Amino acid sequence: MADVRKDLEALKIAMQTEEEGQQLFKTASANTKNSFVKSIFDRLAKDELLHMDLIKKFYAQLEHSGSWKELSPQDRDYRSAKQEMKTIFSSALEKAKAGNLNVSESDVEVYRRAVQFEKDGADLYDRLYNETDDKLAKKFYLFLREMEKEHMNLLDNTLQYLDNPNNWYLLEEGWTLDD
């Protein structure tokens, strides 16, 4: 039972971390005047809610039964932000071509903090993975870590885009805004 209590405490920390991320992204969205930046942070805030729901589900299961359960196909069918982000980036392309993609230094700074926050989240799930012997718990923490890494990569990619849209398109898409 001691291991279950330890696992429940770990899941509480995970829920708090996801809640902090959701608040960070909501606040960032509310404080920006840039529609591109706002749409990215809105999407990430939505994803953090999905993460919290998944953790709460596993917390309740563990608290009730005293054991971990396998991630179901529905749990694994986490809808990543990738497709929605393609749409957001396409819209930003039009603004960048028109010279209307104005990004403030505070937006860039929030992106940097968000990248670090997601890295810290991935590190947390790595630590929790290493601290448990339960195979199902390991799978769960690995899954959460991959979601955090997806966000970290998205934020890093977006930051590169904000720093230099023309170079981003050249590297990512093989063409420039002048083509």
PLM-predicted stretches and their roles:
Residues 1-179:
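Non-heme di-metal
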